[in-house]
Amino acid sequence: MKYIKIVLIFFFAVITNVKAYSKAPVDITKLDVYEIQEAIDNGYLTYELLIQLYLDRIEAYDSNYNAIISINEEALNEAKKCDLEYEEQGRPNVLWCLPIIVKDNIDVKGMATTVGAKALADSFPNEDAMVIKKLKEKGMIILAKSNMSQYAFKAGSSVSSYGTVHNAYNLAYSSYGSSGGSAVAVALQYAPFALGTDTNSSLRAPAAANNVIGFRSTLNLIDTKGIVAYDITRDVVGPISKSVAENALILETLTGNSYDVSDSTFEGKTIAVLDQFLYGDSSIGGIATSSTYSEIVRLFEDALIKMEEAGANIIHLEDFYSYKYELAGNNTMGGWTMCHAFNDYIKGTSSKISSFYELAAASGNIYSLWNNYDKCSVNISYTKTMENKKEEYRNYVNTIFEKYAIDAIVYPNSKNKLLKTNESNSKIASYAIAPVLGLPAVSMPLGFDNLGLAYGIEFLTLKNNEQELYEIITAYENVNHHSKLPEIAPALYEVPESVDKLKEIHESGLKVNLPPVIKILTDDFNVEPLENKIADFFLNYNDYEDVDETAKSLIKEYETLKDESSVYIKKLKKIIVLIIIATIILLIFLSRRLKKAKRKN
């Protein structure tokens, strides 16, 4: 706790002394993408301001986190164009003009793809990766490229030529890897989404360690062209987000499929717990079966109770685990495929490095590539052995799903206590069922331990069953939601209560309860000038030095107008009553005169 307080003091010193950051009448760290677009509709944000607010967060905090390698210098200009198009034709879809951060092994035209190596700082791709093309078709803005474990080599950390990525919730701890920068960026609200890649656990492990959602889809469901490969037999690109609904929006864009993430329940769902992965069994031997960190067990068992109370049929698979499957899962083909894949990839870039050999020989490598270079020729015998193990494993898992009528298997993303930065541990990653079999799996926030460190729970289902997986994690999110902004990276500005109150007035419309006839009688209560003043306040929010006092003044003006109109209406009612009485008297008088006239005739 003392450490956190010291860091907080340091951060606030940074915030107050570096520059005056932009502000808005809404706190972007509390908004999902639907609320962001609504704020733009209400005039509280422009796309240009939105991008600036995210850039401010990167500037304020990232010197301590190292989550970002490069910024898209055209992001603000793209946002300005968005504002002009929005005024002219509206918004075509919910993702339009929203920012996303992508891992720096994914090609974005105009930005270097370094894979975490300064040796590739001049490697500019000739075209966007296929996934980037699809995001841009939706109108999204690539905001930045995220740091990663160099060449996607390590799961225990994200260390590259550009520094070590630190955990979003505690700088002394690891972000995990290799997509650590992407996970930390979303946790810190640098952007609503990020893309990462997953070979063995590279997307899901960092997501778990940073309290965000990391989705690995079925192998080959998403086109990976334009992504620097590690192991082409299991590499997958996927979305990282704070919520399930936001996650599905990105996966829909990348796959072309539609996923229903409306309210879902656990009713009728059978969720199988892999007890061996949860509790471990020392009789089997090996690090992979060591005892699980007690706080993970506590959080996991609490989550199971919540799922069961919500209607899930929880079953326990005590006999699922076999250590040979873990061995098969963690031996990737990266050593053989990486070399050939890079030699093909680099041809489509401006890099001075033209081969894997030259990359291995380059200075500044955090991790040696020579072992991979030595394996550049594929070992056919080893490949066949691995494929046979995978097929055996695949048949086994399919049999288990069918035997117990399972909808999803669930287990902790990791058994171990979160590692400190640069702490060595060879077995921290997610279990390799999903990558070795090409199955979809997602890491969801499990909760925080007694030190405030985040952990994840992983759900896995069968091939091409992303829809059911989204249904299950939607139900999970409803009963075990843990999203929160790291205390050491708070919002850069506060939204005063007066501004929130003024927004309520603005959104409900200025109502002074005047009948339409009043407009004929007087202009004293015309609300249009005040409406314009309020709209100008929100439009030019950053130009107002004291937004709290200005908002209070506008609220007072509105309330005064309401009070005066109420008094006017009361007086008017009295006048109307008198007019009615006078009219009745006149009618009675005229009626009597008419009767007298008739009698005379």
Predicted features and spans:
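Sec-dependent signal peptide recognition
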Residues: 2-9
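An N-terminal boundary/leader segment
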Residues: 3, 18-77, 302, 309-311, ...
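Gly/Ser-rich catalytic/binding loops embedded in alpha/beta enzyme cores
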Residues: 24-200, 218, 305, 310, ...
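Structural helix-boundary/capping segments
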Residues: 60, 137, 187-279, 301, ...
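Gly/Ser-rich, acidic/histidine-flanked active-site/gating loops
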Residues: 106, 112, 236, 256-338
